[in-house]
Amino acid sequence: MAVAFHTLKVVDVRRETPDAVSIAFAVPPELADEYRFHPGQHLTLRRDCEGQDIRRSYSICAGLDDRELRVAVKKVDGGLFSTMCNEAVRPGDMIDVMTPQGRFGVVPEPDAARNYVAIAAGSGITPILSLLRSVLIREPDSRFMLIYGNRTAKDILFKEALEDLKDRFLGRLVVHHVLSREQQEIELFNGRIDADKIEVLLKSFAPASKIDHAFLCGPGAMIDDAKATLTRLGTPQGHIHIEYFSTDGVPVAPRRPSAKDAGETPVAHAHVTLHGSAYNIPMLEGETIIDAGERAGIELPYSCRGGMCCTCRAKLVSGEVDMALNYSLEPWEQEAGYVLTCQARPLTKDIVVDYDEV
């Protein structure tokens, strides 16, 4: 399905925690197919904020059988878009919404009998909730364990929804809340999610080698630690799926020269295919493909510009690029030639990029 923005109406804004809301959108019948999603995918929202074209990606929290399109937005200190969503968005508002994107997740199979593990922190629960709601209904023989970290009990996003799911799917869903700033009776559930906690809790659920899918979502440091732990315990690399919600604790790439520092003479040309149209975009020193497209007035798909959301994913058909950051492409995607165009800078004078070859 082509990546595109459509203007959708907000039909519901629900306060989930003191600093988080969920927002539901009405999807016109003629756009129903375009907004059909897989559990774990996200939406990119776009709006003018104080004269700026701001876009942010937020995960879908609805299940496949909920018959709604809903995302959760947690307020971030200094975050222009998240603050607007939490304080100003009301039912009836119109917001530009990109069609669902992302490969974090799974397509439920009715005959499957799988062992799922999810490790999340904070708003990282959002895509996990969509997975829980979808898998537990559509895979009646599958089991799910969730390890969910927060500061305090009042910070637990979708607490009631998780309790309802646990009661409804008794014996198939196990939920462990780990709190870093609030004492609980069982010491294991105090502090941050770490290797020791993961190892102990896994033993009560299933051998690590028998985990069919492990979904890790939250801050970078937590994800990296959890991935290393699961790998050490025997979970196959291909069974571990990650979605960074922030890069806290993750090494930052060295700063590159920006296009503003460069002259106006192109150092390369990007030959881009998008929605069946071809573009020849001159690139200045220090520019990414997205930077160059923006300067040329060409609307290329992107959202986070930080290498996390994968909205800008495209196939590098020829030429060479260097990606400053990559928190979202799987190893097989890189081997197949996919790049993040918000991070890709040319290493050859000509590069050919195809957004349509997904």
Predicted segments, located by residue:
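Short structural boundary motif marking the start of a folded domain
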Residues: 4-9, 264-270
